[in-house]
Amino acid sequence: MMPDLFDDGDPSTEVADTVRRIAIAGFHALWEGRTPTLNELGGGDGGALEEAVAHLQARGRIEVTADGHVAAVHGLSHRTTQHRIDHLGGRVNTWCALDAIGIPAALGIDARARTACPTCGGELVVTLVAGQPESLTGAVLWYPETAGAWTHLVDQFCSGANLFCSLAHLHERVGAGTDSGTVMTIREVAELGREAWADVGGRP
């Protein structure tokens, strides 16, 4: 299961609501190519906003610029990464390959998820039609796992949630049986994405 925004914390109801508002509204803004300010997303309570941002930052679930703009949240990133989504409205970068496949699956849109095999560097393109991924022969995703809660989503989870061109290349990279995780098919990744991004609604 994808790490939840609150799986390692117990914020107050007000702070939890602010966290979700930042994540969902920030997601839609980034999808549209904007980097909104925290004040735009957080509502009127400055204390709740400050606590919500601290909660997200401490857990690696948001990136904020020095002047207070949201540069990444809920899987989307304004900065260039190795993973991106090409869709009819443009393109957007993501934190990991799982995001690149799972988000358009959740939105039910036509898109191409672009990433690269970490072992050989070969480009991998997953085509989705109305949110349904087409097959990509041999490609599998590594889903990192941990015994406890993730303390930093991007550094600990997203850095390892990669798509590989083959199971052999996955094993070369992570080491067969030496790392904790699950091998997933592209269809399984899409289904997980529908669950993880159910909160962003339908098409943006």
State the predicted function of each range.
Residues 1-24:
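Short alpha-helical segments that sit at the start of domains
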Residues 12-19, 66-88, 130, 139-141:
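Short, cationic-aromatic polyanion-contact patches
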Residues 26, 30-45:
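Short acidic, hydrophobic short linear motifs in intrinsically disordered regions
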Residues 42-58:
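Short amphipathic alpha-helical interaction segments
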Residues 57-68:
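A short, conserved structural fragment
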Residues 72-110:
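Short, amphipathic alpha-helical interaction segments positioned at domain boundaries
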Residues 109-112, 123-204:
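Long, low-complexity, charge-rich intrinsically disordered regions
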Residues 117-120:
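Short cysteine-rich clusters marking metal-coordination/redox-active sites
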